[in-house]
Amino acid sequence: MRSAFYISDGTAITSEVFGHALLSLFPTEFEHHTISFIETTEKALAAKERINKATSRGGKPALVFHTFVNNENREIIESCDAVLYNFLEPFVAPLEKELAIKAKPTTHRTHSIHEKSYDYRIEAVNYALTNDDGSNVTNYEEADVILVGVSRSGKTPSSLYLALQYGIKAANYPFTDDDMEELKIPSFLKPFHKKLFGLTIDAQRLIDIRDGRMANSKYSSARQCRMEVREVEKLYKNEQIPFINTTKLSVEEITAKILTETGLQRYKY
Amino acid sequence: MRSAFYISDGTAITSEVFGHALLSLFPTEFEHHTISFIETTEKALAAKERINKATSRGGKPALVFHTFVNNENREIIESCDAVLYNFLEPFVAPLEKELAIKAKPTTHRTHSIHEKSYDYRIEAVNYALTNDDGSNVTNYEEADVILVGVSRSGKTPSSLYLALQYGIKAANYPFTDDDMEELKIPSFLKPFHKKLFGLTIDAQRLIDIRDGRMANSKYSSARQCRMEVREVEKLYKNEQIPFINTTKLSVEEITAKILTETGLQRYKY
């Protein structure tokens, strides 16, 4: 199998995203390796050794995705027995011309601390944790968005992702069996109607997920899951709460759709 | 100010990472906009209108970062009054040649659900939540890593990030004032010594953070913060627990360093 390396003198997150996006266009398998924080000659030489070994082992040159712009370690990496792809390079000169500014390559800028957005994110994570799963219903004033939905429809991971990635304060509140007889927006959520965003999920997927947690229970029964999904969707429609179906969506897609539909501003860029 | 647009028929996360990495090389400010899920002609035309307005408003052509490969909406976007940057394009033909395979562009592949890694991540988030802050000390068998450190040194956001991004099960355990008189590894953590990873932080930064939460308390006093930091660092050294100082690091950098130092495998690629 062909090896793919994502390498950088920083976190290598940019190289990973770049490499994955490109390789995902090709219907074949790769062996993935990330090497972060190549900041010294020693580390660059160690990386070179790993890459060269992968090439010998695989019989075909490893693919190396990197973002070194001007760096003495770049030469070491470029001397590897591998095919190199640097996604910044083709764009730097055209952008310099367009902006009429010279690029100033500084390592660690993309995924390092930018004071303001950092504090936002930590605060948002704390907010998501203390306002998870209806555990605190007195602090919705502070929320940017309040996710609602039945148990296991994706509320908690989505709230945390909104906080960690975007610094958005997302509370979440679950509709449970007790609410179902006459499902309505609870009184403490009413003043925040405009912040509500609904998640729903296909009943069959919900049955499967709940069955994995509590097999043969009322909670995971087909009858219960179908009823809960039907009731919340009715509520969303009657109360004009925007909602999405999370069945086929990743956390990244759920949160990107929430941002698109609500127009919420991300604090981190 | 020049406008920068990150657009895609998917989440636009790849466009954002690509655009930010490039623009971070230039010492100037931009107005950032993300437009996700451009899946229809209507949405492409609406995006075009927003982009053209930004160009008129700013007096200079907006910068548009996108990853459309083969797509009918691409033509609409390419007809905008803007400068376009497509980071996949320069690399597709060389990679096709190297791999001797034709690229098969499929939208939504990079940040959509890959069944296996999706379940890992949700499970890991649940694990991080139930094993946060020492709230459960009976389930460390299942942990991939156990973060330790004083209160407010970055354990919780790092655990959640490891779970959400990489599907890694990270528990975390806080050393508090009660532990300080004779700081040692608690008995329930001893069997998992090899999973321990320490976080530390500069005392002054710790004072500032704690002061923001509980001003004028023993918890946030200079004396207390200095003592706690000194004691945990002594423990890490005596017990040979690998550790990093999080003071100047973002969550992305902390977790990338943890992966590098522990050699932990990420479940998501």
From Swiss-Prot, chains A, B:
EC number of this enzyme: 2.7.11.33, 2.7.4.28
Catalytic activity: [pyruvate, water dikinase] + ADP = [pyruvate, water dikinase]-phosphate + AMP + H(+); [pyruvate, water dikinase]-phosphate + phosphate + H(+) = [pyruvate, water dikinase] + diphosphate
Broad EC category: transferase
MF annotations from Gene Ontology: ADP binding; ATP binding; phosphotransferase activity, phosphate group as acceptor; protein serine/threonine kinase activity
Residues holding ADP: G149, V150, S151, R152, S153, G154, K155, T156
The UniProt record lists the keyword Kinase: yes
Record has RNA-binding as a keyword: no
Keywords of this entry: Kinase, Nucleotide-binding, Serine/threonine-protein kinase, Transferase
Recorded coiled-coil stretches: none
Family the entry assigns: Belongs to the pyruvate, phosphate/water dikinase regulatory protein family. PSRP subfamily.
Biological function: Bifunctional serine/threonine kinase and phosphorylase involved in the regulation of the phosphoenolpyruvate synthase (PEPS) by catalyzing its phosphorylation/dephosphorylation.
Name of the featured protein: Putative phosphoenolpyruvate synthase regulatory protein
Protein species of origin: Colwellia psychrerythraea (strain 34H / ATCC BAA-681) (Vibrio psychroerythus)
Lineage of producing organism: Bacteria, Pseudomonadati, Pseudomonadota, Gammaproteobacteria, Alteromonadales
